[in-house]
Amino acid sequence: MVLDLNVESPGGSAATSSSSTPPPPPDGGGGGYFRFDLLGGSPDEDGCSLPVMTRQLFPSPSAVVALAGDGSSTPPPTMPTPAAAGEGPWPRRAADLGVAQSQRSPAGGKKSRRGPRSRSSQYRGVTFYRRTGRWESHIWDCGKQVYLGGFDTAHAAARAYDRAAIKFRGLDADINFNLNDYEDDLKQMRNWTKEEFVHILRRQSTGFARGSSKYRGVTLHKCGRWEARMGQLLGKKYIYLGLFDSEIEAARAYDRAAIRFNGREAVTNFDPSSYDGDVLPETDNEVVDGDIIDLNLRISQPNVHELKSDGTLTGFQLNCDSPEASSSVVTQPISPQWPVLPQGTSMSQHPHLYASPCPGFFVNLREVPMEKRPELGPQSFPTSWSWQMQGSPLPLLPTAASSGFSTGTVADAARAPSSRPHPFPGHHQFYFPPTT
């Protein structure tokens, strides 16, 4: 395209007015070029006397306003063929948007009067709890949320919600399934109040999540027995009721505890009338009943008939420990003729007085109850075990020259009276050195 810029004076004739005159191209093709008479040239000089043609490059503002204001689905008026080539795509998309809005408006205009559906379940009134792993069903009544129970499947929870919705709101209630599925329930729920019907739905629900029990308050313990417990009672998380051999026994124990603390309105596994005149066992009273728990702090007094504190030794305890760990102390005077160490003196301070094949064998004199004393009888110890004295010789046992101990001297010393204690019952004799 070649532009010829010629300036034309405004005082010229009408024939010489500025215009766009596309002359035929030199090669005879279908294209053309624009010429602007800016230098005052006459169009007759070039022989260009073709009519003026106007092309609309953009849509008119009136057409755009009409499309934006009119929400109807009627298509816009057709434009001339040359102008359709330069039309942008956005008016047609605006028309499509208007059609889509008109199609969605009737469906979105109807809102549920019972609130939106649950986000965690496809059923109305059903919610999945990750903490317990169960599907729980709730219904709103008089501004309060009523718990209908926890179930293993979302389908069972949805069925419970439908029954409660029909009982609370009538046949026009929004339910999950068809109303014809509950014809048998409609005949039965007429004789029940709302509270009674809710209790029935709760009895049909699952108890605790852990275990495989279908009864409320019953779970399978890891030891293989059935555990019964109550939750949220006396300010505690749960109250332990005991272990039972059968699942039904645990369920009945839960029912008795629930009736005792919550009355006839308690949610039980079986009919509450079956527990008329039934009393909780004593074992359950000790665990569950918080009124009989004695929380007073005091020191329990010993029984004078069971303990004997007459100053005599009631038993011995023999410890085979290391000398460093031995701390046996004589706590009570044994007998006037028994010379013992002063009170508070450890026997480990004199390890040289006792020598035996078991070097860490020491005597622990301690007063123990008579009923806990083991029976002492003849015991088979090696004959080589004997208690000998080390250190300085005693005058009671004089030694001979180089031939060892004298037989007569040892026999006389054994018959002579001494300050040694009476022999301990058994094969061994213990010697306690005299106090200084």
UniProtKB/Swiss-Prot annotation:
GO terms for molecular function: DNA binding; DNA-binding transcription factor activity. It is found in: Nucleus. A motif (Nuclear localization signal) lies at residues 110-119. The lineage of its organism: Eukaryota, Viridiplantae, Streptophyta, Embryophyta, Tracheophyta. Keywords: DNA-binding, Nucleus, Repeat, Transcription, Transcription regulation. May form homodimer. Interacts with TPR2/ASP1. It comes from the Eukaryota. Gene3D superfamilies: AP2/ERF domain. It comes from Oryza sativa subsp. indica. Residues 1-123 are annotated as: Disordered. The gene is AP2-3. A motif (EAR) lies at residues 295-299. PANTHER family: AP2-LIKE ETHYLENE-RESPONSIVE TRANSCRIPTION FACTOR, APETALA2-LIKE PROTEIN 3. Residues 9-20 have a biased composition (Low complexity). GO terms for cellular component: nucleus. Residues 122-178, 214-271 bind DNA. Pfam families: AP2. Probable transcription factor. Involved in spikelet transition. Together with IDS1, controls synergistically inflorescence architecture and floral meristem establishment via the regulation of spatio-temporal expression of B- and E-function floral organ identity genes in the lodicules and of spikelet meristem genes. Prevents lemma and palea elongation as well as grain growth. Regulates the transition from spikelet meristem to floral meristem, spikelet meristem determinancy and the floral organ development. Belongs to the AP2/ERF transcription factor family. AP2 subfamily. The keyword tRNA processing does not apply. This is APETALA2-like protein 3.
